[in-house]
């Protein structure tokens, strides 16, 4: 029989013990399984929908490439704007943690923003939009997705309260896996349908997925919440909680890792205009990337679950580099010397890097789920993700600039190999921040430290 430690941060149920000690209430959404666990179902559906809306991702690329006739650097520039709402996730999280609607912090936000997201996809399908209007619609789609995923992340943390470290790890990885499964489910069809039906039909079909969240969240049982802290007090608590080397070092690492230029948009033009790949094949590629993402999550759960944060970040960075620059084999036609087809070497690094970044974030999510201060569930998760998304936004800007400087356009790809190698070197730049990553002793110290409110 395992005996509980007197130290509330080393006990089997660390968060529950801390809450009881401070006389706080248990989470607003009951995580105990009594019959059907609607909370967990809603969490999985949000993750699944977040992946399923990638059905429209290729259609969006072709919309800007063919309908609006943009060049690679212009596409990169336009696609910066949908990242903005994800940078604002901490603010969104503070709103959902602090401001209740009809006494609830989760259900109303999920219902309203999933419904609004569906309407925005319908506008892409039914309205003849200008370039500016289409960009605004993408911004609002991302804003809605940001609200929905922020609420789901808070539910993951709340449902982890009272669980062991291993159980908390499983809940976090299952939520991320649900997104990967959703993306994987529609990856191939995102290209296949482009050859069979118009973009408008694809946008219309995609609008159905957020509606599923709107309907399912009505079954979510949420206790009435009485606001005890204003948003400014919440912000102060959030800054105090994350202002430690355990978080700051990884934040800087992930930002630098994500913010360098990325060749993905230029490579998309190369595949479609130079190599003549059809939409169905581009969809097949996305299926491959979806499988890679899911395998990455499985690898973490099986092999890296007990690895240190520092080792996980270093290992994934080193593994990603050769995969990331592999398209040089294709752009330099090296594969032709060995009689290997172009299709086998079309590995666009952007999607693989996103998958690896998910793995890099997992240790931070799991740590957060086990030590998060009550009332900041959404805020802390959102802050971690906003760092990644700020890096992604910066990446789009640096990609657009470097694409322009290297004179890569719709049909000129003379400098694409040099561009890919430059992007790869920027990827390795994050390794210079390894000394800033926290040691296991620092992480254990944070687990054992009582958070003052």
Curated annotation (Swiss-Prot):
Q: Which domain of life is it from?
A: Eukaryota
Membrane-topology annotation of the record: Multi-pass membrane protein
Do the record's keywords include Transport? yes
Provide the transmembrane region boundaries.
Answer: 41-64, 76-96, 108-126, 132-156, 176-195, 201-220, 241-260, 280-300, 312-330, 346-366, 416-437
List the GO terms this entry assigns under cellular component, sorted alphabetically: apicoplast; membrane
Q: Does rRNA processing count among this protein's keywords?
A: no
> Where found?
Plastid, Apicoplast; Membrane
- What is the consequence of disrupting this locus? Gene deletion does not affect asexual proliferation and sexual development of parasites in the mammalian bloodstream and parasite progression through liver stages. Following transmission to Anopheles stephensi mosquitoes, by day 17 after the blood meal, gene deletion results in oocyst swelling and formation of unusual intracellular pulps consisting of numerous single-membrane vesicles, which ultimately fuse to form large cavities. The apicoplast and mitochondrion are highly branched and spread throughout the oocyst cytoplasm and are excluded from the intraparasitic accumulations.
* Keyword tags: Apicoplast, Membrane, Plastid, Transmembrane, Transmembrane helix, Transport
To which protein family does this belong? Belongs to the major facilitator superfamily. Folate-biopterin transporter (TC 2.A.71) family.
What does the UniProt record say this protein does? Putative folate transporter. Required for sporogony of malaria parasites and host switching.
Name of this protein: Putative folate transporter 2
